[in-house]
Amino acid sequence: MVEQGDAAPLLRWAEGPAVSVPQDPALQAGGWVRGGSGGGRVAAEAPRRREPEEPAPPEVLLQPGRLELGDVEEDQVVAVFVVTFDPRSGNMVEWCLPQDIDLEGVEFKSMASGSHKVQSDFIYFRKGPFFGLACFANMPVESELERGARMKSVGILSPSYTLLYRYMHFLENQVRHQLEMPGHYSHLAAFYEDKKGVLHAGPGRGGSLPPVYWLPSIHRYMYPEMKITHPAGCMSQFIKFFGEQILILWKFALLRKRILIFSPPPVGVVCYRVYCCCCLANVSLPGIGGTIPESKPFFYVNVADIESLEVEVSYVACTTEKIFEEKRELYDVYVDNQNVKTHHDHLQPLLKLNSADREKYRRLNEQRQMLLYSQEVEGDYSPCEEDLFVLFFLEQNNRIFQTLLEVSASQDKTLTAEHARGMGLDPQGDRSFLMDLLEAYGIDVMLVIDNPCCP
């Protein structure tokens, strides 16, 4: 199997059998799963054509306030745009539909700082209540006016980032078309007319979107919109890149801290790290998370986002702008390549790996190796490695919160070292993490694990 680079196509549509829709989420044994399905890069091959007698697989993505049970989430492209770099004026929106939509700042979000150093890239970002995907390309030209390079991005906005990846291949083709034939927008206009969505006023139409919920069925439907086609997969790349430190990121993600990931361009693969980081915090137990902010993937951010980030209490984002490192009031955790750090004294203990963390990482790799062996020997690719990754942390999180809820419902509400070990935590090394977790989620228990540093 030939190994591919990070820029290889990652995601394509995953079709599956029908999933029955429950009448009441309370009737589901597993409860609801607060999900983070990510966008992704569409594979270059043409999509499989469905035969006439073959039923279309139903969507199972639900968003409270927008869709009813059993509804299908339709395409809702609310804007399409072309951004160009002008040597005299800088980044600017060259063309868009509809013409009256507010695209302020999109010219910087869709063309990341430092993009002139790469030939192509793709960028996920957030614009108010919408999510965006833009494909960037840089083409050498023999033009003194353009200083030897023509740079453009073609992108779209949608209320849901889980739908954006469907149009990756189209956007890649269109940005090349715009570079070679500037000013020809007929294909983009036809695309918008075909895909434009009608948005209705209602809950979640303000400055932030409602949380995304998934039907708790077979494991693969925790992200029904995606299927990894890359030989390594974005989850595998995430594990390989961060190694044992994914357990540090897991704790910060579960605590809903503000996590900012820095990396120079290309930024597309870093947007996937944002998504993977959000996947670490999935919980499917009812009653969990009502008092804590949702895990928000902001994807790419730049200096134009500083004002909006100042009011956020929880997010995961990435940037190519090093100046963010100096603005400590904007983040709790700063990730520079594989270096995870925090300036908050009370969070410093969470940066240290303990024996329980290493054991979890060992088990994760052991399960991955067993899965890969099964795939190679038996040819069984269901479940895939990405299913395993999501389920591993989902089950770990459920085990922790199930124990905490049981202790909080008991008469003495006492959480002991034995409870901590049963949750897969280190009684001493994870004491600070447990205290922060109890406070963040408002769980009423008494922690009686002694602190060895304090007599």
Swiss-Prot record:
Ranges of residues in domain uDENN: 15-187
Omega-N-methylarginine PTM positions: R41
Modified-residue entries (N-acetylvaline), positions: V2
Keywords attached to this entry: Acetylation, Guanine-nucleotide releasing factor, Methylation
Domain of life: Eukaryota
Domain cDENN: 214-362
Region (Disordered): 21-61
Domain dDENN: 364-455
Biased composition (Gly residues): 32-41
Tissue: Expressed within the somatodendritic compartment of neurons, is also present on dendritic growth cones, but is not found in astrocytes.
GO MF entries: guanyl-nucleotide exchange factor activity
Induction: By transient cerebral ischemia.
Record's GO cellular component terms: cytoplasm
InterPro entries with a match to the protein in the record: DENND11/AVL9_GEFs, LCHN/Anr2, Tripartite_DENN
Family of this protein: Belongs to the DENND11 family.
The protein's role, per its UniProt record: Probable guanine nucleotide exchange factor (GEF). May promote the exchange of GDP to GTP, converting inactive GDP-bound small GTPases into their active GTP-bound form. May play a role in neuritogenesis, as well as in neuronal recovery and/or restructuring in the hippocampus following transient cerebral ischemia.
PANTHER family with a match to the protein in the record: DENN DOMAIN-CONTAINING PROTEIN 11 (PTHR31017:SF2), LATE SECRETORY PATHWAY PROTEIN AVL9-RELATED (PTHR31017)
UniProt-recorded name of the protein: DENN domain-containing protein 11
Organism: Rattus norvegicus
